[in-house]
Amino acid sequence: MTDLHTDVERYLRYLSVERQLSPITLLNYQRQLEAIINFASENGLQSWQQCDVTVVRNFAVRSRRKGLGAASLALRLSALRSFFDWLVSQNELKANPAKGVSAPKAPRHLPKNIDVDDMNRLLDIDINDPLAVRDRAMLEVMYGAGLRLSELVGLDIKHLDLESGEVWVMGKGSKERRLPIGRNAVAWIEHWLDLRDLFGSEDDALFLSKLGKRISARNVQKRFAEWGIKQGLNNHVHPHKLRHSFATHMLESSGDLRGVQELLGHANLSTTQIYTHLDFQHLASVYDAAHPRAKRGK
């Protein structure tokens, strides 16, 4: 039988040399495995052969009591299962003691969205230069069609059909979809196209950086965040919030879950159903504000 640390060091070398994992990933594995080493040592274990499912379960409970979140615990147990699988492959263990141990489900975090009043304030930016026109067009398209950030930066001029008010986008899994973008988005795209040649680009991209290249996702994130601050929005404005806001506002207005699924390009309806929880939050807030029986203490 071998020392606890020795086996972990051998495993980390395997991950580095044979699996060629990045230094950051290796460091994460090391941290997770050091946690189980400390727990095992505290409980008198001298080798991994002494580790059984009860030890792993107690380790999981201890991790939770120390404040480790459900998602982080799931990652820790995943690292532990991978390590024990490797020990089994090395004939150091007969079975993986972590195989039947799972973390509790992480609580569902509903996506943040921007309400209609704040969205109107965000879109009403001061147009004082060509880049501001570009940003207004990007904001209008993002909110008007519920695009993913990757879909927005991937748009080419050839993907536009401004006469019909539609764009073609390439979504996840190389799936194309044709989307309406609304009259405001069309108007601002046309305004931007009148100025686009100022950047002297031969690139086919619809939205360009100030250097005349296709705008990057990072640049879009930075510009949207800056506009959120300038327009006085309390919460950080991230491109994905515009997509969430599009979905929420569409569902509040139409109640058509299948239609929203198609517009968002979700393969599974279950992915779209999270917005029904947001819609319920909206209805609940309306109820609490308006219904006589909800007004406690009055």
UniProtKB/Swiss-Prot annotation:
Pfam families referenced in this protein's UniProt entry, alphabetically: Phage_int_SAM_1, Phage_integrase
Question: PROSITE patterns annotated for this entry?
Answer: CB (PS51900), TYR_RECOMBINASE (PS51898)
Primary location class: cytoplasm
Recorded GO molecular functions are: DNA binding; tyrosine-based site-specific recombinase activity
Oligomer and partners: Forms a cyclic heterotetrameric complex composed of two molecules of XerC and two molecules of XerD, in which XerC interacts with XerD via its C-terminal region, XerD interacts with XerC via its C-terminal region and so on.
This protein is called what? Tyrosine recombinase XerC
What is known about what this protein does? Site-specific tyrosine recombinase, which acts by catalyzing the cutting and rejoining of the recombining DNA molecules. Binds cooperatively to specific DNA consensus sequences that are separated from XerD binding sites by a short central region, forming the heterotetrameric XerC-XerD complex that recombines DNA substrates. The complex is essential to convert dimers of the bacterial chromosome into monomers to permit their segregation at cell division. It also contributes to the segregational stability of plasmids. In the complex XerC specifically exchanges the top DNA strands.
Compartments, as annotated in UniProt: Cytoplasm
GO biological process entries: cell division; chromosome segregation; DNA transposition
Q: How is its activity regulated?
A: FtsK may regulate the catalytic switch between XerC and XerD in the heterotetrameric complex during the two steps of the recombination process.
Tell me the PANTHER family matching this sequence: PHAGE INTEGRASE-RELATED, TYROSINE RECOMBINASE XERC
- Which organism does this record belong to? Escherichia coli O139:H28 (strain E24377A / ETEC)
Which UniProt key words apply to this protein? Cell cycle, Cell division, Chromosome partition, Cytoplasm, DNA integration, DNA recombination, DNA-binding
Concerning its family, UniProt says: Belongs to the 'phage' integrase family. XerC subfamily.
Q: Gene name on record?
A: xerC
Which residues are in the Tyr recombinase domain?
Answer: 109-288
Gene Ontology cellular component list: cytoplasm
Which residues does the entry assign to the active site, renumbered to this chain? R148, K172, H240, R243, H266, Y275 (o-(3'-phospho-dna)-tyrosine intermediate)
Core-binding (CB) domain sequence ranges: 2-88
